[in-house]
C-alpha cells in the first residue's frame, strides 16, 4: 500500500477535546487510535473520531503543518474543521471504518 503523508485531527465530540497528529498511513493510524494501541493523550481521553485530515506530498511538509496547527488556538482548529466538515462526521468512513457516533 502506498504511503501518503497526512496531518489529521481527532475529536472526542463535536467542539470537544482535540488531538492533532501526523502519519504516513492514515487508515493504519486511525485503526491504532480506535483500538487504543497508541498510549498517551488519545487513549487516556478516548479521542477516536477523525474529523479533519489534509494530504501532503512529503512527510516534511506534513510535519511542518502539524506543528503550525498545534500552536493554533482551539477556536482556529474548530474553524478549520467546520470549514471542511461542518457536521463533524467521522471521516474514517472514507477508509471503510464504521462511523463513531457523536457524544
Where do the language-model regions lie?
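GIY-YIG nuclease catalytic motif and its immediate N-terminal context
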Residues: 1-39, 43-55, 60-67, 84-86, ...
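A short acidic/small-residue loop/turn micro-motif
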Residues: 26, 72-73
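A short, polar/charged loop-to-alpha-helix boundary motif
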Residues: 75-81
Amino acid at each position: 500500500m502506498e504511503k501518503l503523508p497526512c496531518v489529521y485531527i481527532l475529536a472526542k465530540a463535536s467542539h470537544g477535546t482535540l488531538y492533532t497528529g501526523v502519519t504516513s498511513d492514515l487508515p493504519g493510524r486511525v485503526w491504532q487510535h480506535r483500538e487504543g494501541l497508541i498510549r498517551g493523550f488519545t487513549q487516556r481521553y478516548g479521542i477516536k473520531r477523525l474529523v479533519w485530515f489534509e494530504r501532503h506530498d512529503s512527510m516534511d511538509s506534513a510535519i511542518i503543518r502539524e506543528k503550525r496547527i498545534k500552536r493554533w488556538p482551539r477556536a482556529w482548529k474548530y474553524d478549520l474543521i467546520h470549514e471542511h466538515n461542518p457536521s463533524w462526521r467521522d471521516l474514517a468512513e472514507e477508509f471503510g471504518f464504521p462511523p463513531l457516533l457523536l457524544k
